[in-house]
């Protein structure tokens, strides 16, 4: 949220990273996203090349979806359909045909359309990467700052600190940085890899002058489209958390507590400037069967960085009522931000500048998808049947505009924006000769031996969807690359079983 407020940028601190706290959703993105990567210089990262790695990790438990030729079974990562469905979700599904879209598996043959969610859920509970993928190293409760150690332009190990003790570990092969889009560039810059002038400003000796921390991207959206539905069942906190639902969740892995953080459906649609024949939608809508009014301001208010004044003016009048939310967002924003060091103290958070709406077109598109959300509620029989109505309260700072007019929606979009916690791109992958890249197509840091980056920071551009599944794909592909580049390695503790039958899967 803006109006001089800071946006929350949560990260997962623990084994499994942000898969410990994400919204569960399993979305691969669009085929054309990866073909664009290849076109931009990321050789070997086209859809045809990455698709097998999605299949390799996947264990899809929904037979209606798992057997359609676009999914894997037998992998480590459990993917299942959300088993809980409210009357709001049924209205959302029925509205799809009224808007001219199909209701489909958005990870299947085509992406454009409305869909029920699939997510990394096993027996109703979160299935993080730490839970999914086996490993032999003992679990450690301590978490530490670490950074690569260098001898000239070669990574030779890692230096890290637990409590007051500094440790050094030397590598026989490579150092692999997987700190994520925020921490990986911070670690590299602290180690002397980054923009020359920025490192000089902080007195850090230069090892490699690379655009580390540039190219920051995230999906941009807003939480400000909320509705009341008198004839529907929403997820009210007072009705959600009770002994019966708790028992059903704990013992059966069923019930409303298994919902994906309240989000039930999503739609991938086209803006007026997008070519629908490409099946490369540029706008997205999440449908959540609740709103910040549903929990009396206990959880969601803080999660989106909402002020007390906004809550009192917009949401308090709807407390205790059946409300729901559309989260519209722009899938491929053109604005680019940066990650920079605040200081040389590794325990101090870096400076994050998402630079939202640097390109005005991003604001135009967000306003357009907000208008589509309003139209869905006001002009579809599916939502009229459940008595869906727009909130009649106005957001502070936009009161001078007519409610839900173009000017009002644009004002709200600009001032109540939030990022969807899908940051990528700060260690961009691509052609080594390209001055905008940090790592090559095999994820090796340019100009530095024995150093790779393996996480979402290497994405050249955002994918058209949530980033959890694509980052897992990157890790699967990277593991093969590392083995190929180190043929003299000792055998790994995890047996590498190829679970891909080449002729089985449709492309």
Where are these regions (language model features)?
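N-terminal glycine-rich phosphate/pyrophosphate-binding loop and immediately adjacent elements
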Residues: 1-55, 201, 209-211, 219-228
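Short FAD-binding loop at a beta-strand-to-alpha-helix junction that anchors the flavin cofactor
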Residues: 18, 444-462
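Glycine-rich phosphate/pyrophosphate-binding beta-alpha loops
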Residues: 23-24, 457-469
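Classical protein tyrosine phosphatase
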Residues: 33, 46-52, 91, 95, ...
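Conserved redox-cofactor binding core of oxidoreductases
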Residues: 38-155, 224-242
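Mid-to-C-terminal "cap/lid" subdomains and adjacent gly/pro-rich loops that border
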Residues: 79, 146, 185, 195-320, ...
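Core beta-strand elements of the Rossmann-like FAD/NAD(P) dinucleotide-binding domain
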Residues: 164-178, 182
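FAD-binding beta-loop-beta segment adjacent to the flavin cofactor pocket
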Residues: 328-340, 427-452
């Amino acid at each position: 949220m803006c109006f001089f407020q800071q946006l929350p940028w949560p990260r997962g601190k623990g084994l499994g990273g942000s898969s410990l706290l994400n919204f569960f959703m399993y979305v691969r993105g669009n085929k054309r996203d990866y073909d664009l990567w290849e076109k931009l210089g990321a050789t070997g990262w086209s859809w045809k090349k990455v698709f097998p790695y999605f299949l390799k990790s996947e264990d899809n438990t929904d037979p209606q979806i798992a057997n359609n030729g676009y999914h894997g079974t037998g992998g480590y990562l459990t993917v299942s359909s959300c088993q809980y469905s409210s009357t709001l979700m049924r209205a959302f599904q029925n509205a799809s045909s009224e808007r001219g879209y199909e209701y489909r598996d958005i990870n299947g043959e085509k992406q454009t359309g409305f869909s029920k969610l699939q997510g990394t859920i096993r027996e109703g509970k979160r299935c993080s990467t730490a839970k999914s993928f086996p490993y032999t190293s003992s679990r450690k409760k301590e978490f530490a700052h670490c950074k690569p150690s260098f001898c000239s332009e070669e990574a030779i190990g890692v230096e890290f600190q637990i409590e007051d003790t500094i440790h050094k570990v030397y590598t026989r092969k490579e150092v692999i940085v997987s700190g994520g889009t925020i921490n990986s560039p911070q670690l590299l810059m602290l180690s002397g890899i980054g923009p020359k002038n920025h490192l000089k400003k902080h007195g850090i000796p230069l090892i490699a002058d690379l655009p580390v921390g540039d190219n920051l991207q995230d999906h941009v959206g807003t939480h400000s489209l909320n509705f009341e539905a008198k004839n529907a069942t929403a997820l009210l906190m007072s009705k959600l958390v009770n002994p019966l639902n708790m028992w059903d969740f704990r013992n059966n892995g069923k019930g409303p507590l298994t919902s994906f953080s309240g989000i039930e459906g999503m739609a991938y649609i086209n803006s007026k400037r997008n070519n629908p024949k490409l099946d490369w939608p540029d706008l997205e809508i999440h449908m959540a069967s609740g709103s910040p009014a549903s929990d009396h301001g206990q959880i969601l208010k803080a999660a989106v960085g909402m002020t007390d004044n906004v809550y009192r003016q917009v949401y308090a009048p709807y407390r205790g009522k059946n409300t729901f939310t559309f989260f519209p967002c722009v899938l491929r924003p053109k604005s680019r931000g940066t990650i920079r060091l605040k200081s040389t103290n590794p325990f101090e958070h870096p400076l994050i500048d998402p630079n939202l709406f640097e390109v005005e077109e991003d604001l135009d598109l967000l306003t357009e998808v907000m208008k589509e959300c309003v139209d869905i509620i006001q002009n579809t029989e599916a939502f009229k049947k459940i008595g869906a109505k727009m909130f009649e309260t106005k957001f502070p700072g936009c009161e001078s505009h007519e409610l839900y007019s173009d000017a009002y929606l644009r004002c709200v979009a600009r001032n109540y924006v939030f990022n969807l916690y899908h940051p990528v791109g700060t260690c961009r992958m691509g052609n080594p000769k390209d001055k905008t890249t940090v790592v090559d197509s095999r994820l090796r840091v340019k100009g530095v031996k024995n150093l790779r980056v393996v996480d979402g920071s290497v994405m050249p551009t955002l994918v058209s969807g949530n980033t959890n599944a694509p980052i897992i794909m990157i890790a699967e592909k990277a593991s093969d690359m590392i083995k190929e580049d180190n043929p003299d390695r000792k055998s790994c503790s995890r047996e590498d079983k190829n679970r891909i039958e080449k002729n089985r899967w449709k492309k």
